[in-house]
């Protein structure tokens, strides 16, 4: 398995393309000068395209991925209705979802042979809309509205339209600020990192009565932390055994173990990392974590070690200015 790491640096308007070697070392393959401030990125399900959200002209860019080394070639673009804070796709590669924090909306853009077309759906009124996360069954779009302490739930139709589910939302505690999400591989649980109180909510996707329930809320900060909480990103290992979340004020990555059924998290440790870690990701083998320091202008690679899933720094690399996003492709 070959793996490629992509990092987006909006201040220098660059995408760095790295080959992730089997021993965890990174080799620079390409630096792409992008037509704007590149921020959120996602790889298409078929591994053939990288989609990138850019500002200040709100667009989604499509880059074709070279199979042998992961290098990028520009392939197309489409306008977006709001400044892209987070982008994702459905599991079949038919649609791109874009969440806009500033414009408070989520949109659906169709993909034709991998290239983005004209937006077909926009849902507004989502204050602080921070991500769009398709459920494992490809039917429900979970959309955290950070400023409203709620996660809105939409049914995705076959033609890409969104309609409110029943229930239409789930709510967090006041002041939590739900931000980003991941789902357990067993498709039974979702995990949301809350930006404003740096906590993790564990959501049971459907209990026997068909309800969605928060079954655990866990603090992700060290007991002696007294600063302003400012959580950012969250990811889970491919086997579902460990979960990681980062806080930008403390510049740490918190390590969690996950119970076998996915319902319970336990803190295993806190890893100091690059200054102001806005984004990070895991490789597809579950062996390495790559974190980006928005204020250090570097990325760091960590070994994931032992049953606790603790992190050991393996290497550190300069990237562009203000790196904010990391994605990993396996091909």
Swiss-Prot record:
Disulfide bonds: none annotated. The keyword Transmembrane does not apply. Pathway: Carbohydrate degradation; pentose phosphate pathway; D-ribulose 5-phosphate from D-glucose 6-phosphate (oxidative stage): step 2/3. InterPro entries: 6-phosphogluconolactonase_YbhE (IPR022528), Cycloisomerase_2 (IPR050282), Lactonase_7-beta_prop (IPR019405), N2O_reductase_N (IPR011045), WD40/YVTN_repeat-like_dom_sf (IPR015943). Its EC number is 3.1.1.31. It catalyses: 6-phospho-D-glucono-1,5-lactone + H2O = 6-phospho-D-gluconate + H(+). Pfam families: Lactonase. Keywords: Carbohydrate metabolism, Glucose metabolism, Hydrolase. It comes from the Bacteria. One of its GO terms (cellular component) is cytosol. GO terms for molecular function: 6-phosphogluconolactonase activity. One of its GO terms (biological process) is pentose-phosphate shunt, oxidative branch. Belongs to the cycloisomerase 2 family. Catalyzes the hydrolysis of 6-phosphogluconolactone to 6-phosphogluconate. This is 6-phosphogluconolactonase. The lineage of its organism: Bacteria, Pseudomonadati, Pseudomonadota, Gammaproteobacteria, Enterobacterales.
